[in-house]
């Protein structure tokens, strides 16, 4: 796509300098920007806050982001606020995100919710390129925005595609389409009367069935405590996926945070850093 057609674009490379992970080759323009990295609690892992300076995604907007994590580097990415998709009467909003992880690299991407308002159309395509020793933790939260009638599913559609490659081999293709006009969103097989959706991927060489069972034991009790549905499944590689249905964003954020904290403590032997957004 011609660069002039992007509403916002961002390129970021992180490498390990022998002491800590640092950034280089940062480029952003128009509606996307990245804030100078911070090292929370004297961590060696930089945290980058990605910002949409326009405040929301509008009709026909197109965004592109490319992140490279070099050998032995680690990075945390997050957003500064929710991604708000307003009504798109003519053209849907498109977002393309590519993540390239080299040997022993680790990417932690924990974004705020994607909120689709009445008559919104949103398409997101993520591509993850990993090596055998690369690691990834990635989350998404989908939330219905305000509508005049108060109904939850008044957006036109939300279409999210995630492709995960390891050593150039496609190991996971996740194609999620929520289209209230053509699907019975509240029925079994879709949202099952819940209004909010959350998901996570974790890929690491140490992932096995024992670890997956342990993660599930950590989060399974929340299904009754918060009236939500939680499921975890092994990916066709050394990783797992988590799905959550709930009625509130905060419930999904809490469960995903527990999973992220479990991974930080049990895989990386570190405490999870509070992102200090507010």
From Swiss-Prot:
Keyword line: Chaperone, Cytoplasm, Nickel insertion
InterPro entries hit by this protein: UreD
The keyword Cell inner membrane belongs to this UniProt entry's keyword annotation: no
Pfam families: UreD
GO molecular function, one term: nickel cation binding
GO cellular component terms given for this protein: cytoplasm
Keyword Cytoplasm found: yes
Main location per the UniProt record: cytoplasm
Subcellular compartments: Cytoplasm
Family: Belongs to the UreD family.
Function of the protein: Required for maturation of urease via the functional incorporation of the urease nickel metallocenter.
PANTHER family given in the database record: UREASE ACCESSORY PROTEIN D (PTHR33643:SF1)
HAMAP family associated with the record: UreD
Subunit comment: UreD, UreF and UreG form a complex that acts as a GTP-hydrolysis-dependent molecular chaperone, activating the urease apoprotein by helping to assemble the nickel containing metallocenter of UreC. The UreE protein probably delivers the nickel.
Protein's name according to its UniProt entry: Urease accessory protein UreD
Species whose genome carries this gene: Staphylococcus aureus (strain MSSA476)
Gene transcribed to yield this protein: ureD
